[in-house]
């Protein structure tokens, strides 16, 4: 029913933002990634929307990119994955990282989402993997050779390890761009930590 909303950003809550348009304040559920991109209160924003209607609930879900919206909708096609679980996955991982985790079958990465167990992670991989394009195997921002699956796995593990150690995904990605991706996982992590600690 709705394609997008453009209006004044009013504020943020635990799992939603408020956008005012024509005197009406819209409660829009969203991911941590989109929340982190919110401007100052009173500034204009635009979110791409998906409306979910159930017997006892009508909700708007919004994202700052069409790519994130499409990934949200794709996750909802998986049995056992509802809006909360989908938002959780999009909050702990950028869209491209989530895509390539699914493509290489990285259940550990997917299980980081709240309410996502091993069985659900396996279903997500099974039901979505073939729907993703081969060139989406790798997060393009990490500039990995898509032909070398071992490098992809190593970088995925290194990225997850750095995040687990408390570094932000942005910090981890930034330093991993400069590391030799043909090295072992252990050495990639060691070299990344050296770079991060100066």
From Swiss-Prot:
Alphabetically ordered keywords of this record: Cytoplasm, DNA damage, DNA recombination, DNA repair, DNA-binding
Protein's GO biological process: DNA recombination; DNA repair
Region (Flexible linker): 144-149
InterPro entries per record: DNA_helicase_Holl-junc_RuvA_I, NA-bd_OB-fold, RuvA, RuvA_2-like, RuvA_C, RuvA_C_sf
Disulfide partners: none
Source domain of life: Bacteria
Any Pfam family hit: HHH_5
Quaternary data: Homotetramer. Forms an RuvA(8)-RuvB(12)-Holliday junction (HJ) complex. HJ DNA is sandwiched between 2 RuvA tetramers; dsDNA enters through RuvA and exits via RuvB. An RuvB hexamer assembles on each DNA strand where it exits the tetramer. Each RuvB hexamer is contacted by two RuvA subunits (via domain III) on 2 adjacent RuvB subunits; this complex drives branch migration. In the full resolvosome a probable DNA-RuvA(4)-RuvB(12)-RuvC(2) complex forms which resolves the HJ.
Protein name per UniProt: Holliday junction branch migration complex subunit RuvA
Origin species: Clostridium beijerinckii (strain ATCC 51743 / NCIMB 8052) (Clostridium acetobutylicum)
